[in-house]
Structures are given as C-alpha cells and as structure tokens.
C-alpha cells in the first residue's frame, strides 16, 4: 500500500469532511472542511492497517485534519466548484420533464440529496428531491438557491 501523495504535496478535498468524533472541541457530525479546500500533506499514516490517512494542514482555515486518500486529489488537478451542497434548498429554474411529461414545474422547490461530480463531461449534477418521493438528476444550471422569497420570485417572473 503505497501513498498517492507525499509530504508537502498540495491537495484538494473532493468531499465535505465532518467530525467523526476524533476532532477535539467540535460536535460529532460538525462540518470540518468543505470540498474544494486546498491544504498541504503534513503526515501519512494508516487506520486499521488497510486505509491510508493523510494529515492535511489547511492554511487558510488554520486547521489540520485527517483525510482518507479517496477524499483527496492534487491541487493542480482540474476542479470545478459546485454551487450547492447536501440539504440545500433549491428551486427549478426551468420545467423538468422525463419522456415528454413535465414532472417539475419552473419555480418548484426541491432539496439537494447528493452532489454528482463523477462525469466531468456532464458537468456538476445533483440528485434533487422535489417532494412526494420524486428524486431527479438535475444539472446545476437548471437550479437556483432558494435562500429567499426574492430569489423564488425572480425565477417565477420569467414565466
């Protein structure tokens, strides 16, 4: 088991990292670092003899956390930041249809269930729950943050 990253390498988080109970002074489940943050590999160790754990220092945040190898890429690797995160409330900026049947009307509220970044040619996509058990895979450009009544009215004004 050889490490993919070496001491001093600049790396980027590709997943949000939450406290698993081992980070002092913060509640379990608290967000430690957002995806996209860049840090420097400070140390490499193992967990349960089969997982490489990198101690990464994030200078801008002044925080050092343990990261699994699959949570990191080189900072120099291509990266597109995503606009939304898990549980963010969003609105559809256009009607969404499957096989010609409109399932979601423009302006309908939804909630982000998952961020999908595995297919770069498709861009950032999301699993969005629109209520009544309806979950659709939606491209980022078809969504807007539902952070205020003004944002919702702005989308609906275009109808």
From Swiss-Prot:
GO biological process: nitrogen fixation
Keyword annotations: Nitrogen fixation
Domain of life: Bacteria
Record InterPro entries: Nitrogenase_MoFe_mat_NifZ
Family: Belongs to the NifZ family.
Name of protein: Protein NifZ
Source organism per UniProt: Azotobacter vinelandii
């Amino acid at each position: 088991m050889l490490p993919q990253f070496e001491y001093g390498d600049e790396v980027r988080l590709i997943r949000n990292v939450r406290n698993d109970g081992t980070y002092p002074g913060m509640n379990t489940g608290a967000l430690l670092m957002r995806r996209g943050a860049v840090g420097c590999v400070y140390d490499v160790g193992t967990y349960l003899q089969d997982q490489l754990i990198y101690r990464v220092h994030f200078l801008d945040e002044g925080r050092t956390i343990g990261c699994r190898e699959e949570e990191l890429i080189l900072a120099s690797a291509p990266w597109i930041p995503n606009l939304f995160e898990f549980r963010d409330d969003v609105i559809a900026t256009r009607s969404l249809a499957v096989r010609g049947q409109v399932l979601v009307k423009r302006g309908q509220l939804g909630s982000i269930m998952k961020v999908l970044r595995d297919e770069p040619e498709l861009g950032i996509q999301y699993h969005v729950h629109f209520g009544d058990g309806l979950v659709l895979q939606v491209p980022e450009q078809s969504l807007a943050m539902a952070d205020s009544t003004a944002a919702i009215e702005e989308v609906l004004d275009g109808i």
